[in-house]
Each structure stands twice: as C-alpha cells, then as structure tokens.
Amino acid sequence: MNRFKASKFRHMEARPSRREAWISDIRAGTTATCGNHIKSSCSLIAFNSDRPGVLGIISLEGHEENKRHVTYLGCHSDLVTDLDFSPFDDFLLASGSADRTIKLWRLSSTGEALPSVPGVVLGPEELPVDVLQFHPTADGVLVSTAGRTVKVWDVAKQQHLTELEAHKDLVQSAVWSRDGATVGTACKDKQLRIFDPRARAQASQSTQAHENNRDIRLAWTGIQEYLVSTGFNQMREREAKLWDTRVFSSALASITLDTSPGSLIPLLDPDSGLLVLAGKGENQLYCYEVTPQQPALSPVTQCILENALRGAALVPRQALAVMNCEVLQVLQLSDTAIIPISHRVPRKAVEFHEDLFPDTAGSVPASDAHTWWAGDNQQVQKVSLNPAHRPHPRFTSSLLPTLEPSPNMEQPAELPRADTELSEGFSSPSSLVSPSTPSSLGLSLSSTSGIGTSPSQRSLQSLLGPSSKFRHAEGTILHRDSHITNLKGLNLTTPGESDGFCANRLRVAVPLLSSGGQVAVLELQKPGRLPDTALPTLQNGAAVMDLVWDPFDPHRLAVAGEDARIRLWRVPPGGLKNVLTTPETVLTGHTEKIYSLRFHPLAADVLASSSYDLTIRIWDLQAGTEQLRLQGHQDQIFSLAWSPDGKQLATVCKDGRVRVYDPRSSPLPLQDGPGPEGGRGARIVWVCNGGCLLVSGFDSRSERQLQLYMADALAEGPSALLGLDVAPSTLLPSYDPDTGLVLLTGKGDTRVFLYEVIPEAPFFLECNSFTSPDPHKGFILLPKTECDIQDVEFARCLRLRQTSLEPVAFRLPRVRKEFFQDDVFPDTAVTWASALDAKAWFKGANGQPRLLSLQPPGMTPVSQAPREVPARRTPSSAQYLEEKSDQQKKEELLNAMVAKLGNREDPLPQDSFEGVDEDEWD
C-alpha cells in the first residue's frame, strides 16, 4: 500500500456472524500439530473432532430452514495432524496423520453419506505426517512433510515424484508458491528454504527466519516473489515477517505483536493481499494488508472473538457474498462451534464492485501431475466473481471415482455421539491390507443398525470389498468408582513373554517388585483405594516370570518362577486375608527358568509351560507330574498357544520359525514355517475358529507387524502381512472368538489397535483404536460374561497403570439398543467349565465346549424387530409460499381472514340486553 494513497480496505469491518449462523453442537479437538485443524472448500467444511483420527464434515451453506448436521469421517487410527481440500474439486479431501499415512477421500455432495475406506493411501512414512498441501495449478500433486522429510507426490500413481533434501530438524511448514513452481519450507532449525522440486532436490535459497524455533508458519502472497512467515523472536514475542525471495538475506518488513504463547496461524488471501493472523487459544484476530510498497504490513482491523480460537480457515473467494462486499470470511473453530467471521467493506450501492473483487483462479486445473512434472508452467484460468457471469465450469478430479448413493438407497444411520470423557480414547478406522500395498477403494456403505442392508448396498459392498461392522467401536475407561487405586510397588520389569499380570472374573494377580517373588491378589468386586499399609501376598520364593489363573477354578493361580519351578496357589474364596507362604503344589522338571504358562482351553488340570531349556512340558496337575515333553526349538521360545479344540499347540521362536505340534502324537513339530524376521519378541494366537494363526512380531527394521498364517499350510508362509508402527514393546494380542476381533497393544503403549480378522482377503479389517491418556503397563481381556450386553458392550478389559487398575469397555454404537443385537453377540463358549478331565485328554479323548446365549431376559433380537417406517417429510411453510405468486398469497390471506371471522348467525351480545319498559319513557 502506498503511504500517500488510502487503502480501499481502510473502512473494512470484521464481525462474527449471528448465533443463528453458527455451526454449534460440535466437539472440536486440537493437538500440538502444525495444522490449522479446519479447512473449507466451496461446499464443505472439515475439522478435527475430539476423537483422535476422526474428522467432522458439514456443509458450508445451510439449506432453507434445516439445521446443518455434522457427520463424522473415521480417517485414521491415530491423530489427524493436517488436512486439505483440493483447490479444484470441492469433495476431494486429503488427510495426514500420526499413523504415518496420507489418505484421500471422495466425499458426497451433501457431506452426509461418508466413505468408510479411503480412495488412495500414500505411505507409510517413517515418522508421523505433519503438513500436507495440494498443488495450486496441477491436479493430483501433493506436498507433505514427515519429520525432516519433504516429499512431492503423484497421487494418481501413488508414489512420490521427488524427496527434497533432508532438513536438519523437524519441518514445521511447507507451502506452494501461487504459480506452483516452488516450495517454501520452515524448519525447527530456524531456516527458511526455497526449493524448485522439478530442478533439483537441494534448496535454491535459505535464510534464518526467526530467532526462536517455536512453530514457524509460512504463507505465500499473490505476488510470486513475496512470502510471509510467523513465529517468535528471542524475547518470545510473536512476530510476522515479509520476505522478498529476490533479496532473501533479510526480511523486507516485520511486525511484533505481543508475548502471548499461542502460535500464530497465517491466513493470506493472495487476491486481496489481506493477511489474517489468528492465535491458537486466543480471542482476537488481526488483519493486515500486505503490499510490496512500504509500509508493507499495514494494520487494517481487529476482531474480538467470543470464544477461544482452536483453529481457523479461509473460505474460498468463490463462496463469498460479493454483493454484500464480503472480501474475506474466516471460519473460527472453537470447542463447541464453528463461527463464521465476515470481513466487509461498507459501500452504499448494492452492486458488484470490481475494485474489491479482481478475477480469481478458477476451479479447472491447468495441468496434471505428469505434464507439470515434465515442466509445464501453465496457470489456472481466472474467472470473474461477478454473479452475473456465473456459473463457472466445475471440475471433478479423476483421481477418485465419484460414487453417489442412489436416491432410494438406505443411508447408514448417523453415528451417535458417545458421552466421552477426557479419559476416553477414540480413533477411527480405515481398511489397510498392507502399508506397502495401499488400497484404492471408494465409498463403502454398511448398515449399523443390525437389521440388514438393501440390495443396492450389498452390490456396492461387493464392488468395494468388506468393511467391519465393528469399525465404529468406541473404547471408554469406566467411571473412577470401578477403579482400584493406590497400587504400590508393582513389578514393571516382568519378561516380555509375560502379560505382566493376569485376571479372571473375580480377581487380579499382580507381581510386586519386593524380594521373594511376591504376588498381590486384588478382588474386582472391591474397587476403591487400597490401604497404604502392606497388602497380604503370595510369597512365591523366586522372581515371577509368568502367572496365569486356572480357567476352570477361579481360586487357583499358577506362577512360574525364576528357579524353574511352577507353584500352584489356592486363594481363599473371600480373597487373601493373610500372607500365604506354602503353595498347594510345586511342579519341578525344567532345568532353566520358565518363559510362559498356558492352561488347556477344554481339559481341566492340563498346563503347558515353556522354558529356557528350549522344551515345552505339559503337566497333569491332578497327578502333579510331567506327562509330555515337546522338542525341536533352536532358540528362545517367544510364545505358545493352544488351539481352540485343544488338540494342537502352536509356538513362535527366536530362530524365526512358527511351529505347530500335536502333543499327544509326537514330541516333534507337525509342521513349521517362516516366522517374523526380528528377534526382539513375538506372540502367537489362534484365530478364525482355529483355521488361522496370528503372529505379532517385528520385521528386520524393528517395525511391529502382524502375520496371518493358514494353520494347515505354515510352510507356505504368511497369507497376509500388516505393518503397524515402530515401537520397542511387543504387541500382546487378545482375541475374542465371538466377534473375530483382536486387540493389540504393548507394555508402555497408549494405544490399543482393533482389527477384525477374516480368513480371506483383505484378512485385516481395521476398526477404531482406543487411545488412553497415559501409558499402560498391561492390558487383559475379561470373559464375555462381564460385558454389559444391553449397552452393546462387546468386550471388557482391564488396564494396568503404574498406580491403578482401570476397566475399559468397548461398545458398538447402535440406534435401537432396546433390542438384543444378535449379530454382535452369538452364543458364546462356556470357558469357565471344563469339557473333560486331564486323564481323559492324555488318553486321546477330545471335548466340545458348551454354548451359552447372551440374550438378556425380556429382550427381542434385533433380527426379529419390526422395521421402522421412515417419517414422511412434508415441505416447510417457507418452501410452500415460495412456490406461489404474490396474487395467490394475497387471496389465500384474505380467505384465511374471512374463514376465521366467518358468517356466524349467533345472536349478538347486545341482543340479550333487556331494555326499559314502555311506561318508563315518560
């Protein structure tokens, strides 16, 4: 702005809209990421919800008198760190996450029928994705950052075109210049860098940006050579700087605001040159005009906000109310609402003002990824914002197919919002088969009511592949009244082969750090704060290696010691009252310390143990003797598991092999196959009714992964492999045979993965993962009978913290909870009653578990519930009146008034009055 020429924006006013225009009743969530937490296209708004991995989607404009409803898109299994709409396709959304992937989503025009699987998956990266942005001129080009890495992606080919030179620290911002030729980055090493990604991977220019390395953001102006950065100076004051890339050694201009700790979000409109600075956690917006002349950063206006700002976004210029002289609209994301803030220049005439609204870039891309990478520099054709020159041609990207539901298609019920608390964790689903083979899937609709799907839905599902009915599962830490607190002296260094603690429906056994291998036994029916005095314990006499409850006797506990002995303890029915020093039975036979213990799933008094002597021994507890000894392992045995029918035993070993034994027929393995490459630890569990084996372990790069084997074809290797993340602890699987769900988490993790495992492709169906507020030391699945069936609780677990024990409930949102959800709760096996005794099993007999219905008395199965008839929607009065002419409205109004008055023949009130007599007139 020339100092001798008044700015056309000098009288601009910024005002929050009326409450009627707010998008309320939302629950926004923010994290310490480089993103703005909210983005807008000309049609839709997307924002971070309070559930990790879940985005809220809502229409930008309300329709008639209808209230806008937020729908939720389950994007990732961890926090969404950044998101962006395509500048050309209003319904193409990209999301980046802490789960190290970038996903592209095709949204519907209404924003209601949301996809359950992404259209494209990019990655995974080595670190969480921090920033992403679509290219401003070419369709299908995306820039992203992850840690110190910056990549430019060809979305159509699902591969990166180039990886820019590694930065020296975390990349905090990456933005395209308006012509799409260069990329500007801001790094935690305080450097600004300019890249020409098509020329070379090294930076063409660099300079020091701000003296403080905290949260530097960038925004490119409408003039190619100018760049705005925001950050903090050495005095921790917030500041903004304007840079001329032709003279990049120092800033062209700078302004200092205040010492507030909230990071500045720069929102710059390249057409008008208006810069809005929004501070996270604050209630004020600053607006400046950016010009190449001095003063280069001129204050225009400020706006006081009613609520604290959690995120902010600009509405595209093509969606502005230009006839009202609205030159900017900022969407403020608060904790409970999205508030439009309109910036208007007062003008007397209600007309289109060309000086306020120059032509802007249209919605048709100038090129695609291939032509742009080949050197094409065509610019997007500009269009007028004058309403008289609209509509402009719209563009639909071919990157993802457009799948709109037919008008008569049943829409999935909106996911009810859970009454979540701060202690809850919720992460959303996506269907990944393998990180190395990203899926290219579109919209997938499935019923969440438990009643069934329409033929059109089934045909769509057959086209796009299956999705889990548990994908919207919600994990909740139950109320504090059910917690056991004030735990002290826990042994948090149990071997990796042990779960760290064990539980049944009555009590929990937790090893303590004190000498002598002490084990505390806590009653689940007596929650609350434990006394500060010492608890009565089991004096094992040797350090505890593993411990497990007898599934058929809730009072018997087996404890494996470092002295190669197995001790069987009997806990009194009311719990421990005194210290127990003498076990019921001591089993001796192993020559080295023991890895793990596993009870037989059907036969009473049968126990398997693995040891450092590289053998597995099977014990008859009734006789107190070793009956079988399995051999063939060449190294440490990581894990063992009984098959559901109790006939076979599977192991995974440090020698990189998975083995299956038939213990009663041979001490050598029946078959074996290749196992995980990493030697840090592994677990094995039978899934899919015993038809498959699931192994969790590490690959050669120490990435945690899942491998699924066909139980009768181990030699062929895994049928499916799924990489998860990089973490030091082994994933401990807890499998629920009724639902086919496996819960996976490690000691010291804060996240529990949920997958539905099926025996055919895609094998793993990802569901919402559970995120806890702090790391847990163990995670145990309780028997199905502990679940609240009426609340559609399909799993209940115990979470061990350093000082407390917390129950966690996993529920499935259902609309008609008054019915028994028989599709979620099939008859369950009676795991607490044996099918045969040890003597019969060792002689070759087999048994079958009894089945128990979980249907509560008086509840009707949802499969037998009457179908709900959808209410017929009648047009609103406003819509009805709009369809009539003025003359018709006038006639109807007069008729209504006449009808109200009516032609009544009733006597008038004065007719009943009595007059005076005739003689009184005289």
UniProtKB/Swiss-Prot annotation:
The modification Phosphothreonine is found at T874. It is found in: Golgi apparatus membrane; Golgi apparatus, trans-Golgi network; Cytoplasmic vesicle; Cytoplasm, Cytosol. The membrane-associated form is phosphorylated on tyrosine residues. One of its GO terms (molecular function) is actin binding. Residues 423-456 have a biased composition (Low complexity). GO terms for biological process: actin filament organization; actin filament polymerization; cell migration; establishment of cell polarity; Golgi organization; Golgi to endosome transport; positive regulation of hippo signaling; protein transport. The modification Phosphoserine is found at S459, S462, S912. Residues 881-893 have a biased composition (Basic and acidic residues). InterPro entries: Coronin (IPR015505), DUF1899 (IPR015048), G-protein_beta_WD-40_rep (IPR020472), Quinoprotein_ADH-like_sf (IPR011047), WD40/YVTN_repeat-like_dom_sf (IPR015943), WD40_repeat_CS (IPR019775), WD40_rpt (IPR001680). There is a cross-link at K469 (Glycyl lysine isopeptide (Lys-Gly) (interchain with G-Cter in ubiquitin)). PROSITE patterns: WD_REPEATS_1, WD_REPEATS_2, WD_REPEATS_REGION. One of its GO terms (cellular component) is Golgi apparatus. Residues 386-462, 854-922 are annotated as: Disordered. The keyword Cytoplasm applies. F-actin regulator involved in anterograde Golgi to endosome transport: upon ubiquitination via 'Lys-33'-linked ubiquitin chains by the BCR(KLHL20) E3 ubiquitin ligase complex, interacts with EPS15 and localizes to the trans-Golgi network, where it promotes actin polymerization, thereby facilitating post-Golgi trafficking. May play a role in the maintenance of the Golgi apparatus morphology. Interacts with clathrin adapter AP1 complex. This interaction takes place at Golgi membranes and not AP1-positive endosomal membranes. Interacts (when ubiquitinated at Lys-469) with EPS15. Belongs to the WD repeat coronin family. This is Coronin-7. The gene is Coro7.
